Amino acid sequence: MASTGLPQLPPSQKAVIQSEKTPGAFEVSENRPVPVPKANELIVKVSAVSLNHCDWKMPGRVPCPGAVDGADYSGTIVRMGEIAALKSGFQIGDRVAGAQMASSRRRPWAGAFTEYLRDEYDMVWKVPDNLSWEQAAAIGCATTSTVGMALWISMKLPGTPENPIKEPKLVLVYGGSTASGTFAIQLLKLSGYKVVTTCSPKNFKLVEEYGADKAFDYHSATCGEDIRAYTNNTLEYALDIITEARTIRHCYAAIGRGGGRYCGFELLPEDLIATMRKSVKAEWVMGLEMTGLEIDLPGGYYRKANPELHTWFCDWKERYVALFGSGKTKTHPITVRQGGLEKVIDGIESMRRREVSGEKIVYPLYIKGC
């Protein structure tokens, strides 16, 4: 890697890591090494990070003491490996965004909550000029890739934003006021679908602004039955962002008598699914699969390497970047919190306590004016 004439990088950096002493807890390390890129990698100086539920869920389920945490980020390319420099189309100084495969036993260095990170060049995307650091970090890759996988790989929906269906069909997005939910709603509307969704009544206006045709209160014990009545027993597709026993039951209750497809964002409880209608095909997706790498996680999360899915992601990435760049889709509502990496842990704990609703928490790491 040639670095002649480039500013020297510091030898060490700060990072939010999984606690060495307390499983599921986090701490700020002051002396993590600044990475050196492999041939197909970039080094990115991180400008902003956003929070996802996986930032606290996965470390709790699969503790990796000392591993860097965090998925979504935006930042500036400061170094490039030889292959990345030749093939990526990027240049030093480009604004990029992406998602890290954090909390990995094989890749403990991988994580967004740090000052400098390394990433494969085909896992990042160039940030359009109309997006700020904070907006780009809020998009990241985790949400966009998982939603895309759910709609077109798992649920096999006909129609895309580029080629919408001509006769609208109904799709349920359970958890519409989440970042994944508002993105899914927008994609479905662009693809020609009618969208029913669930959220708290305080967020009805929010999901309607993003395109939902009808919102239902997920607190209601008859939520699923109410959706089934509203859709005249014809609903075929349910995307469950939340994926808990209660939400699975609601989604199955909403799907019409003819059956259909259900897709969750979490490992499905086999004992529960075994008791549900066989006319509904149930699957779940995991955004980490977009890397194409083996996902070496226990407890049902293991995945074989899937290079075909990575190829799909590389195409999908260019498509959703174009949607945001053209203004056809917009980011989830953002709440910017100051304090840098030292305060990221507070945000993670807020999410763990379920205090975040209808907003995406973003922490800028850059100095204004620089």
From Swiss-Prot:
EC number(s) recorded for this UniProt protein: 1.-.-.-
Effect of disrupting the coding gene: Abolishes the production of xenoacremones A, B and C.
InterPro entries xref list: ADH-like_C, ADH-like_N, GroES-like_sf, NAD(P)-bd_dom_sf, PKS_ER, Trans-enoyl_RdTase-like
Positions bound to NADP(+): 54-57, 177-180, 200-203, 218, 265-266, 356-357
Protein's pathway: Mycotoxin biosynthesis
Region entry Disordered, spans: 1-32
GO molecular function: nucleotide binding; oxidoreductase activity, acting on NAD(P)H
Enzyme class: oxidoreductase
Origin: domain of life: Eukaryota
Keywords: NADP, Nucleotide-binding, Oxidoreductase
Family from the record: Belongs to the zinc-containing alcohol dehydrogenase family.
Function text: Trans-enoyl reductase; part of the gene cluster that mediates the biosynthesis of xenoacremones such as xenoacremone A, a compound that shows inhibitory activity toward the PI3K/AKT signaling pathway and which has the ability to induce apoptosis of A549 lung cancer cells. Within the pathway, cooperation of the hybrid PKS-NRPS xenE and the trans-acting enoyl reductase xenG is responsible for the formation of the reduced tyrosine-nonaketide derivative. The alpha/beta hydrolase xenA then accelerates intramolecular nucleophilic attack to give a pyrrolidone derivative.
Quaternary structure and interacting proteins, as annotated: Monomer.
Protein known as: Trans-enoyl reductase xenG
The encoding gene: xenG
